[in-house]
């Protein structure tokens, strides 16, 4: 059994770590709430663009933008949204597993992939796993800007437009609630037909200038950018929620470990006192 002094030192060390994890939990709660607000603020913009695109496409069925045309798949592209930092449980690992599953399905069909990586953890993953990374960006901070993402997104959109990739996916974590984050791999391009009720009913009657086709060309690019930005913001909220849970579990585990060590310390101290008493009694008897 370890000595009382050694156990005391270990308890003090764990208490110090517990204070750090507790503070990190509180910081994560605050950051998660801010990320949720950003997520809620950006969603209406993306939804409205989607509705307008759906209306434009329905009103001009003869015009087919390349982003809306299905074609035989010879190569696919992925935009991966990961975190810049760790200490967020299995958030990134679960996302990488979902991505690898999708990649394997295409690889089995003889289809290779290109990647755009957002976040340092994703870049680290591809350094060890391998893959054709054509664009990468990291260190976006707590409040990512869509302007920071446009360059990397454009690389993948141009690749699709020029026929270098035939299908484009977005891999990120969905923020379901504080306790649940879900890794998803969703198809970005070609864009699926809208199932929005307002679009299907055809209740809108707008005039578009300079013309509907030019507007559709511009809006489709903006929509793709907004979808990726929304994924980055939502992934940020999922990251903070996962970090909050991880730090709470670490704090709770530290508390349990301290209790166990305190019990061991008390037993060690009791054994030491008992031994001292035995030695005193033995010495007195010898006299």
From Swiss-Prot:
Subcellular location: Cell inner membrane
Membrane topology recorded in Swiss-Prot or TrEMBL: Peripheral membrane protein
Major localisation: membrane
Disulfide-bonded cysteines: none
GO cellular component labels: plasma membrane; proton-transporting ATP synthase complex
InterPro entries: ATP_synth_F1_ATPase_gsu (IPR035968), ATP_synth_F1_gsu (IPR000131), ATP_synth_F1_gsu_CS (IPR023632)
Transmembrane region(s): none
Keywords: ATP synthesis, Cell inner membrane, Cell membrane, CF(1), Hydrogen ion transport, Ion transport, Membrane, Transport
Pfam families in the cross-refs: ATP-synt
GO biological process, any: proton motive force-driven plasma membrane ATP synthesis
PROSITE patterns the UniProt entry points to: ATPASE_GAMMA (PS00153)
Molecular function (Gene Ontology), one example: ATP binding
Purpose of the protein: Produces ATP from ADP in the presence of a proton gradient across the membrane. The gamma chain is believed to be important in regulating ATPase activity and the flow of protons through the CF(0) complex.
Homology family: Belongs to the ATPase gamma chain family.
Oligomeric form and interacting partners: F-type ATPases have 2 components, CF(1) - the catalytic core - and CF(0) - the membrane proton channel. CF(1) has five subunits: alpha(3), beta(3), gamma(1), delta(1), epsilon(1). CF(0) has three main subunits: a, b and c.
Name of the protein in question: ATP synthase gamma chain
Organism: Azotobacter vinelandii (strain DJ / ATCC BAA-1303)
Upper lineage: Bacteria, Pseudomonadati, Pseudomonadota, Gammaproteobacteria, Pseudomonadales
């Amino acid at each position: 059994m370890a000595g009382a002094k050694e156990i005391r030192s270990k308890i003090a060390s764990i208490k110090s770590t517990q204070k750090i994890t507790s503070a990190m939990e509180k910081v994560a709660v605050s950051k998660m709430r801010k990320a949720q607000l950003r997520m809620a603020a950006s969603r209406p913009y993306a939804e409205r663009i989607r509705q307008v695109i759906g209306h434009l496409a329905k009103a001009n069925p003869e015009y087919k933008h390349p982003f809306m045309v299905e074609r035989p798949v010879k190569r696919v592209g992925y935009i991966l949204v990961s975190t810049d930092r760790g200490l967020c449980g299995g958030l990134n690992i679960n996302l990488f597993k979902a991505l690898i599953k999708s990649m394997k399905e295409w690889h089995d069909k003889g289809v290779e992939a290109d990647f755009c990586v957002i976040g340092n953890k994703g870049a680290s993953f591809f350094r060890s796993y391998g893959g054709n990374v054509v664009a990468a960006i990291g260190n976006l901070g707590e409040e990512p800007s869509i302007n920071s993402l446009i360059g990397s997104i454009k690389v993948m959109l141009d690749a699709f437009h020029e026929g270098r990739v035939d299908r484009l996916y977005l891999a990120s974590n969905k923020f379901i609630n504080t306790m649940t984050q879900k890794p998803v791999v969703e198809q970005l391009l070609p864009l699926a037909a809208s199932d929005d009720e307002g679009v299907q009913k055809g209740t809108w009657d707008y005039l578009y200038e300079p013309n509907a086709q030019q507007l559709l060309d511009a809006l489709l690019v903006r929509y793709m950018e907004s979808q990726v930005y929304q994924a980055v913001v939502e992934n940020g909220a999922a990251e903070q929620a996962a970090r909050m849970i991880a730090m709470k579990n670490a704090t709770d585990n530290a508390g349990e470990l301290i209790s166990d060590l305190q019990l061991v310390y008390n037993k060690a101290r009791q054994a030491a006192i008992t031994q001292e008493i035995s030695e005193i009694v033995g010495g007195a008897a010898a006299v």
